[in-house]
């Protein structure tokens, strides 16, 4: 009652009382009799309080079309990231915006496909489109396909069961580009191939970078399949495969042995040496992969594989029978001859009917080369059965001894080169004898009218690979170079031969593609 009296006095009538615009005094007086005063009064004052405090907000709500649509303006306006995060903590529904932020930032953190610490220029140029692909929901399919470049091999295995890989003869495999691929390359590991000689095991001999092993050749107008050792050995079952020529063909022979040996069981593969011939035996397939030493193809005073470093080289330009008797019955013959011609501009040729090497004449190199190739092609045409034997001629393997040509005037031969020449347009003047190149190409295409000869052009693609040579990570006189010798690349760097795994693997992949894309011979 005391409280009621105070309230009544505070709101009482009379001229000195408080102005009562809503007539609350009469309402209180009438309700006092019914005993419901506290509830009624509380309700009235609550309504008054709401109207006074939120009147402006209520009017703005009735006028704001966004509010009528039930959408919060903060969801449309994109503020600074820090403000976004602050609102998200106060208002939980804002977490949707936070997820969108994470999705937009994802490519900056996720795309870690390049495995090397130093990406190549080609990779760097390709990184931007890869990042953009991850931003779009549909693009993960594209990024997943990138590492699976050898997919055509899977498709061609089925086709190969019928004898074909499906790569057309019209596709020029010599034109293309080197693509960095550390997913599917190298095709084998140096330490996994027991048949490599110390001349080509660059990593074992002290080379620190292995980037040279991870470049895939991509032809311009078609694709080559990945090398399938078991598929290839099935084609070679019961057959002989032979490389004939100089040390570059021996380099390629070692590569081929390492490519195929994985298809055989331990103890079912071994190598034998027989005079000028080295033979890899694949016991389970009753097949051999061989190398025959004949640096000029015809007979010469350099035919001893153990003592052939002769300063004055002399050839019998029209004598090939002594060598060729070892080529009879071979199912695949791969020839080459070049590097041994390059120490002089003129070539010494034994005179017809001469009885000793002293009886010789000097002939311009290109003329002697054409004469030897004509002798060789005539033998092929007269002695090879095209229904049984396939014949190939490998083009020139280039040297890299002039670093100023590729923009490294301070370099020493091919030493310390770790990258191919990328995005290079036009010829590279490395000293390659293009007259000899064209002579070999023309003879291969025209001289043997009865037997097809496939000229395998590996010259231009190999000219880009200044990084692939053994350099100072090789042997000299049967021994690995000492640290002192390795520190003198001007004297000891070998810029002729190639590290394995490496460039010759691609040469063999071209051979594999051509062979497996043709019908199997008898």
Curated annotation (Swiss-Prot):
InterPro entries: TBL, TBL_C, TBL_N
Family the UniProt entry places it in: Belongs to the PC-esterase family. TBL subfamily.
Primary enzyme class: transferase
EC number per UniProt: 2.3.1.-
Active site positions: 247 (nucleophile), 494 (proton donor), 497 (proton acceptor)
Segments for region (Disordered): 111-157
Cystine pairings recorded for this chain: 171-222, 193-258, 202-499, 414-495
Membrane topology term: Single-pass type II membrane protein
Lumenal side: 59-522
Compositionally biased spans, kind Basic and acidic residues: 124-134
Protein function: Xylan acetyltransferase required for 2-O- and 3-O-monoacetylation of xylosyl residues in xylan. Catalyzes the 2-O-acetylation of xylan, followed by nonenzymatic acetyl migration to the O-3 position, resulting in products that are monoacetylated at both O-2 and O-3 positions.
Topological domain ranges for the Cytoplasmic compartment: 1-37
Matches recorded under PANTHER family: PROTEIN TRICHOME BIREFRINGENCE-LIKE 9-RELATED (PTHR32285), XYLAN O-ACETYLTRANSFERASE 1 (PTHR32285:SF10)
Record motif DXXH motif, residues: 494-497
Tissue: Expressed in roots, leaves and inflorescences.
Gene label: XOAT1
Origin superkingdom: Eukaryota
TM spans (from-to): 38-58
Glycosylation, residue list: 182, 286, 442
Source species: Oryza sativa subsp. japonica (Rice)
Gene Ontology molecular function: any one: O-acetyltransferase activity
Protein name per UniProt: Xylan O-acetyltransferase 1
